Amino acid sequence: MAFGAPRGRGGDRGGFGGRGGSRGGFGGARGGRGGSRGGFGGDRGGRGGSRGGFGGDRGGRGGRGGPRGGARGGRGGARGGARGGAKVVIEPHRHAGVFIARGKEDLLVTRNIAPGESVYGEKRISIEEPSKEEGAAPTKIEYRVWNPFRSKLAAGIMGGIDELGIAPGKKVLYLGAASGTSVSHVADVVGPEGMVYAVEFSHRPGRELIGMAKKRPNVIPIIDDARHPQKYRMLIGMVDAVFADVAQPDQARIIALNSHLFLKDQGTVVISIKANCIDSTVDAETVFAREVQKLREERIKPLEQLTLEPYERDHCIVVGRYVRSGLKK
């Protein structure tokens, strides 16, 4: 132990470097346990590996013995986007307007109608497609990842729902739009030729919904109570599909009132049912059966019922066909 050695920012310090090594201040080396440690730009050998100081990049979770020099990318890439190009292949889903990104992991995506903009921090994937004109530069197309843990509609698609009722060029009435997470993806699906009428009662998420709609011209935000559709009847024409995620005890009545006013004959009704919001005293299956019967009484013929497990607990999605002339046997 060299207590008599000169000390300072440029010199060597042996005392605390101990166990056979020496420690430099901002540019020296520390021999602790067989390795060397640089200050702001050096290497640290501690337990057999090397570590860049403030001048190096930090790698992933690579263990104590291995090098830690890789770029830091969080869990699955930077938040703003996902790696695309040649490593990701976009395939059309069986539901028109929905796509699957095949890569390291398969992702549900929609084509971004407002490129460069994300709504809730979702990943974006840019793909270059060859131009149809000979000699022209390839076209860059952006897709947004549709998270089934953030969207009941995406959870239904992942669960294998047969009929969606939402496709390019369609007009959709969305009840319970909240801040516009799912609405933005529905807007991507229907495309510039379609239209989404998004109804939300709460003003706080309604402000975010309006902000999202400013960048998507095919979204019309309506901040009003879906229990009184006559208040906004002058804003909405006839629609091809109604999607409802209102989570209210009287949601069947809310859906029926809006369907009677705005939904075309043979139009599609898609409902997300949360059992606890309707009746928490009975099991979920009983609640679902009661709601389906209420829909039958309102001339909505159920076509399929699908649980949203594992994405949502005690939730199901029901798809029905609206018959204006009366429910056919």
From Swiss-Prot:
**Gene3D superfamilies named among the record's database cross-references:** Phosphorylase Kinase, domain 1, Vaccinia Virus protein VP39
Picking any one GO molecular function of the record gives: histone H2AQ104 methyltransferase activity
Where is this chain's protein located in or outside the cell? Nucleus, Nucleolus
GO CC terms in record: box C/D methylation guide snoRNP complex; nucleolus; small-subunit processome
Give binding positions for S-adenosyl-L-methionine.
Answer: T181, S182, E200, F201, D225, A226, D245, V246, A247, Q248
Among its keywords, does the record have S-adenosyl-L-methionine?
A: yes
Reaction(s) catalyzed by this protein?
L-glutaminyl-[histone H2A] + S-adenosyl-L-methionine = N(5)-methyl-L-glutaminyl-[histone H2A] + S-adenosyl-L-homocysteine + H(+)
By its UniProt entry, which InterPro entries does this protein fall under? Fibrillarin (IPR000692), Fibrillarin_CS (IPR020813), SAM-dependent_MTases_sf (IPR029063)
Gly residues bias: start-end ranges: 13-84
Please give the Pfam families that the UniProt record associates with this protein: Fibrillarin (PF01269)
Decide whether keyword Nucleus is in the record.
yes
Task: Please state what class of enzyme this protein is.
Answer: transferase
**What post-translational changes are documented for it?**
By homology to other fibrillarins, some or all of the N-terminal domain arginines are modified to asymmetric dimethylarginine (DMA).
Quaternary structure note:
Component of box C/D small nucleolar ribonucleoprotein (snoRNP) particles that contain SNU13, NOP1, SIK1/NOP56 and NOP58, plus a guide RNA.
Instruction: Sum up the protein's function in the record's words.
Output: S-adenosyl-L-methionine-dependent methyltransferase that has the ability to methylate both RNAs and proteins. Involved in pre-rRNA processing. Utilizes the methyl donor S-adenosyl-L-methionine to catalyze the site-specific 2'-hydroxyl methylation of ribose moieties in pre-ribosomal RNA. Site specificity is provided by a guide RNA that base pairs with the substrate. Methylation occurs at a characteristic distance from the sequence involved in base pairing with the guide RNA.
What the record says about family reads: Belongs to the methyltransferase superfamily. Fibrillarin family.
Under what name is this protein listed?
Answer: rRNA 2'-O-methyltransferase fibrillarin
What's the encoding gene here? NOP1
